[in-house]
Amino acid sequence: MQKTRFDELVDFPCHFTFKVMGVASDSLPDQVVEVLQEHAPGDYSPSVKPSSKGNYHSISVAVRVESQQHIEILYRSLSDIEDVRYVL
């Protein structure tokens, strides 16, 4: 893992909000929470917003992260969900 300026700007542990965008499905929020529970157990209440045409959902959830590496693991794991298109 490369040391970046990001390391200087963020004090860990902290809460980090992930925004996951994917194909609209009733199971997507549960899949996101399942991945989060695997890597960062906690009580999550994701916020779900549908796109204007209803084809996609944007899911926002705050997660307590321990390090930059922890954030990167979560990004990769969330991106691996089949219906996910973007993770911000």
Curated annotation (Swiss-Prot):
Pfam families associated with the record: DUF493 (PF04359)
InterPro entries referenced in this protein's UniProt entry, alphabetically: UPF0250_YbeD-like, YbeD-like_sf
Top-level division of the source organism's lineage: Bacteria
Gene Ontology cellular-component terms listed: cytosol
Family that this chain belongs to: Belongs to the UPF0250 family.
Protein name: UPF0250 protein IL0958
Source organism per UniProt: Idiomarina loihiensis (strain ATCC BAA-735 / DSM 15497 / L2-TR)
